[in-house]
Each structure stands twice: as structure tokens, then as C-alpha cells.
Design a protein with these regions (language model features):
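Hydrophobic core segments of alpha-helical transmembrane domains in multi-pass membrane transport
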Residues: 18-24, 92-96, 185-189, 227-231, ...
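Transmembrane-helix bundle segments that line or gate the permeation/cavity pathway
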Residues: 27, 231-241, 245, 275, ...
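Transmembrane helix-loop junctions and nearby membrane-interface residues
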Residues: 99-100, 127, 242-245, 276-283, ...
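Alpha-helical transmembrane segments and their helix-start/interface "positive-inside/aromatic belt" motifs
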Residues: 174-182, 258-273, 419-424
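Soluble mature domains adjacent to a membrane tether on cell-surface and organelle-surface proteins
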Residues: 251-259, 266, 278
Length: 439
């Protein structure tokens, strides 16, 4: 692996770096600018949400990459990686927990989008060849599976007129194509093999672990744990969405809902096929896409020559050519996706057998709140041998145990623009102080 080299920066350069970093962070919607993403996606049409998630947020990450690896690479940013990794890890965890608490389909996807951007920022911030390659791979994968998920949410909104998770349910009976394609996106973002999210997340886990082994810094092991926990919570969140939107009881008002037009299905199919293909053939992606980009990122000379022509950097810079360490990619692009697919199929088969053999008979008698209520049902005093999955919040126990954390997050996310402007000012101040002191 390779670390960015170090030298001295003057105060003006540090201030410029801090201002540029905050600007690109705002464009990427990373913490503490994440509430902007939820509002933007909530108001935008599904097709625009695909562009916001797939292009706009990536432009912020691209700016940070250019800032870190090209503009300031030879000016001493070795310590800056800790800020990027910290902010990326916080974005991962905070936004996935915010997603768990959402009751709107598109706002939930918006918070997941920023959580996945946290993965990308963390990987890029490691300043290693493997980490950079993993970050680019996950950025590409995020564009694919999040585009698919937003199109699925748009299909649901188009046919039902709502994205309220508490009003939806049972749509798999009416929209089987949308349901199946949504599940492909859900499995991909959750990091399940053989979909693309597993491949890129596995690279990120490996990159953070190797960084910890190389530096002896136990903090990078904590980052690995945070990334793994975030994946588990992501899967939990999409289990919630699946049972709230596509499974369970179909409300009477949606009895006449039909599948979306073929053109909308084809668009989702394209994303779904790419999610599977980039997961089954990760070595192709790393060899021809991410590895060349990573090599260019760690060599300013190579990047300049790629943009301006071979030999241009040597002609213009002469003896001032920057020297960076070589990058090792010995373990990039090696997986056995077929083996992991076999393990997944066996596990799913075992779970299905257990679930079918342990099913219960349904009883209709219930006291307290209506069975249709999807939140805090069991406070209503319901007494029955069996209750519908769609009738309760699957993760109420988790949220109850974390109630103080969620109450704190609820108070922070007040919805008042002035509060969010204060967050931006505080973030800018902290970035300036960190860069002035540490770099």
C-alpha cells in the first residue's frame, strides 16, 4: 500500500484546504450536511433522485479525491486521512440509524445513500491503493443499486400515490416485477453475495483491516467493526421496508393497483442486471476500472500525462516532479463469488425449511389497537397466539433499547434551517482548527 507523502503547509494553504473540503462535503451530503439529502430526495421525482444519488453526491467525493490526491498530494496530507476516515465512519453509522427510524420510503433511501457514501469516503481516506480501489468500486456499485432502489420507490409512488410505509403493504401481489427487482437492489446495498455490494464492501473491510495491521492503529479495526455493523443495520432496514411495502396485508384501497409500464420495468432490469454482473465478475471491474484509476491517483505524473499527453509532466516540471511510493494491488480483485452464492443458497434453504416447519395458525381475535397499526402495536395490550408481521414494527425492540440515542438524534434533526446552518458553521470551524493544528 501507499500513503500520501508529507511536507509543510502554510496557514493560507491550510485555510484554503479546509474551505474546499467543506464545500465538497456539502455537495456529497456527508455528516453534518446529511439532512439536506433527505429533504432533496423527498421532494424530487424518482428519476431526479437517481441523478442526485448517482451523480451529484459522487461529484462531491470526486472533489475530495482531487483535493486530496492531486491538488495537495505533495504538500503533506498524511494526517488528513484520519479526518476523512472519521467523518466517513460517522456518516456510515449515523445515517443508517436515521434510516431505521424513517416512515417515508424515499427519505429512508436518502439516508441510506449517505450511509453508503460514508463507505466510499472511509475507503478513499485510508490513502492506500486497496482502499482507494475499493472506494471507487463501491461508488460505482452505489450508483447502480441506489438507482434501482429509487426507481422501485418511484414505481410504488406512481401506482399508489404514496411513499408512507405505514400506509403500504402487500404490493408483491400486485407488482411482482417491481418487488423482485427491489429485492435485488436491497440485497446489493446490504452486501449479500453474489451481488455487487458484497464485493466492494469486502474490499473495504480488507482495506481497513490491513491498514490497522500496517500502522498498528487499533482505531482502524474499530472502523472495520463499524462498517460491518452498518451492513447488518442496512439489511435490517430493508427487511423493514420489504415487509412494510411489498409483503404482509394488502390495504383495501390498493386492491386495484397494477404493475408499472414495461418501460419502467426495463429501466429497473438494466440496473438489476448490472448489480449482479459487477458482483459476479469483480476482478474484471478492479482490473479495468478501479485499479487504473487508483494508480493514476497515486501518481500525479501519470495523471497529468493522461490528461495532457505522454511526457508533458516531465517537460513542464522537469526536476520538480513529485515522487510517491508505488502501489501494491496483489490482493485486489480476487474472490470466489460462486462459492459464496452456494453458501447463501444453502443458508436460505435452511432458514426457509425452519420457517415453514415452525409456522403458526392465524387467529383473528385481538384487543387494543387495530391490527393494521404498524407502530407500537404491543403497547395496545394485544393478546393472541399469532399476530401479522405487517401489524407491528419488527425493530421496535432495537429502537426501544436505543431510545435515548434516537431521542437525541430526533432533537438534533429539528427541521429548522437555522439549526442546519449552525451545523455547517461548526463543521467549518472544526475543519479549520483540525487542519491548522494537525497538518
Amino acid at each position: 500500500s501507499s500513503d500520501v507523502c508529507s511536507s509543510d503547509l502554510n496557514n493560507s494553504t491550510k485555510l484554503a484546504f479546509a474551505l474546499l473540503y467543506i464545500g465538497f462535503s456539502t455537495k456529497a451530503f456527508i455528516v453534518p450536511f446529511h439532512p439536506l439529502a433527505a429533504d432533496a430526495h423527498g421532494a424530487a421525482p424518482a428519476s431526479i433522485s437517481v441523478l442526485i444519488s448517482g451523480v451529484l453526491t459522487k461529484s462531491g467525493i470526486y472533489g475530495i479525491i482531487r483535493l486530496t490526491y492531486f491538488l495537495f498530494q505533495t504538500m503533506g496530507l498524511g494526517s488528513f486521512q484520519f479526518l476523512l476516515v472519521f467523518v466517513g465512519s460517522v456518516s456510515m453509522f449515523v445515517c443508517v440509524t436515521m434510516a431505521l427510524a424513517q416512515h417515508d420510503f424515499k427519505r429512508l433511501l436518502a439516508y441510506h445513500s449517505i450511509s453508503q457514501i460514508g463507505y466510499v469516503l472511509t475507503a478513499v481516506g485510508l490513502c492506500t491503493g486497496l482502499g482507494f480501489s475499493a472506494g471507487l468500486y463501491h461508488a460505482m456499485n452505489h450508483t447502480l443499486f441506489k438507482g434501482l432502489l429509487f426507481l422501485a420507490a418511484g414505481a410504488v409512488l406512481y401506482q399508489t400515490g404514496t411513499t408512507d410505509l405505514d400506509e403500504l403493504g402487500g404490493l408483491s401481489k400486485k407488482m411482482p416485477w417491481t418487488t423482485g427487482l427491489f429485492l435485488v437492489g436491497a440485497f446489493s446495498i446490504s452486501g449479500l453475495p453474489p451481488f455487487n455490494g458484497f464485493a466492494s464492501k469486502w474490499m473495504i473491510y480488507q482495506a481497513t483491516y490491513e491498514k490497522a495491521a500496517e500502522t498498528g492503529n487499533i482505531g482502524f479495526l474499530l472502523v472495520t467493526v463499524i462498517a460491518l455493523v452498518t451492513s447488518v443495520l442496512t439489511l435490517a432496514s430493508f427487511v423493514k421496508v420489504s415487509q412494510s411495502v411489498f409483503f404482509g396485508r394488502l390495504p383495501a384501497k390498493f386492491e386495484n393497483v397494477t404493475e408499472v409500464r414495461p418501460g419502467m420495468i426495463i429501466a429497473m432490469c438494466i440496473f438489476a442486471v448490472l448489480c449482479v454482473a459487477t458482483g459476479l465478475f469483480p476482478s474484471f471491474v478492479t482490473r479495468f476500472v478501479t485499479e487504473p484509476a487508483a494508480r493514476a491517483a497515486f501518481s500525479v505524473v501519470q495523471y497529468i500525462d493522461a490528461m495532457m499527453g505522454t511526457g508533458y509532466a516531465a517537460t513542464v516540471m522537469g526536476e520538480d516532479l513529485p515522487i510517491v511510493a508505488t502501489v501494491s494491488f496483489t490482493q485486489v480483485g480476487y474472490w470466489s463469488p460462486v462459492s459464496w452464492l452456494l453458501v447463501l443458497c444453502i443458508t436460505l434453504l435452511a432458514v426457509t425449511i425452519v420457517a415453514v416447519s415452525a409456522r403458526y395458525d392465524c387467529v383473528s381475535q385481538s384487543r387494543g389497537e387495530a391490527v393494521e397499526a404498524k407502530y407500537d402495536l404491543f403497547f395496545g395490550g394485544e393478546e393472541s397466539v399469532y399476530s401479522q408481521v405487517g401489524g407491528g414494527d419488527l425493530f421496535w425492540g432495537f429502537k426501544h433499547n436505543w431510545r435515548h440515542y434516537f431521542d437525541f438524534m430526533h432533537r438534533l434533526h429539528s427541521g429548522v434551517v437555522n439549526d442546519y446552518a449552525l451545523w455547517a458553521a461548526v463543521a467549518l470551524s472544526l475543519a479549520i482548527v483540525f487542519i491548522q493544528i494537525v497538518l
